[in-house]
Amino acid sequence: MKRNIYLFLLFLISNYALGQIEPGFALVNDKDGYVNVRENPSIHSKVIKRLNNKELIYVYDEEGQKENWLFADNDGYIYRDRIKWVHSFDSVKKTGESENSISFAGNNISITITSQKFDKRKHNIKYKDSYVYLIDGREPKGIDGYLPTDEYKDFDITIDGKKTIIPKDAYSDLFEPTAWYVKVYYDKENDTVYIVASIGDGAGAREVCWQIEKGVYKRRKTGIPF
């Protein structure tokens, strides 16, 4: 009797764990070299687009997760075993943190990210019905209609002794950076670094991932963590 109860509880826990999907970034990883994104969580559902291997996506945590299906990029569904999570790669160790900076080092990688106070005199701000809707011509992320208090200042990155440049437009529309929530991952097989950060809070919250391949900045992806 006790054994049956134990097995039943184990079954429930396993099903619960399998059903829980934490929001986060992932890479398309399919033996066919691509994955189909479907309108609904069914193999018979309409294919709305195709994503190639190594494409960076954001998986949402919401009721749309169905059995072995994931809701990706707020567009459609992909099969759960067709991706590789960014957080599954090796972590690069955090080596320092202050109020406005955070540093990481390891695997011949050195990263320091700094922030600064937002100075509205240095920006072109557009309002709509008293809400901020454009900063320097771009839709701001990390805020919900109010003026930001902090912004990114610089990304100082060295990989294998060479500087990696992160262009300003890869972070100039991101506000309210959170120094204590930044993680760095390294995919050794593909020599790719991923910097994952959270910005803002409440309705303005965003998650961001910068992808650096073989020492060269490739792309940025953002997602809404709710």
Regions found by a protein language model. Name each.
Residues G204-V208:
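Structural motif
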Residues I21-A26, K49-R82:
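SH3/SH3-like beta-barrel superfamily modules
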Residues Y131-K183:
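Mature extracytoplasmic domains of secretory-pathway proteins
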Residues R80-G137:
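Surface-exposed beta-loop interaction hotspot
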Residues N15-G19:
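Sec/Tat signal peptide C-region and signal peptidase I cleavage site
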Residues N4-I13:
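Sec-dependent N-terminal signal peptides
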Residues S110-T112, D191-S198:
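Short beta-strand elements that form the blades of beta-propeller/WD-repeat-like
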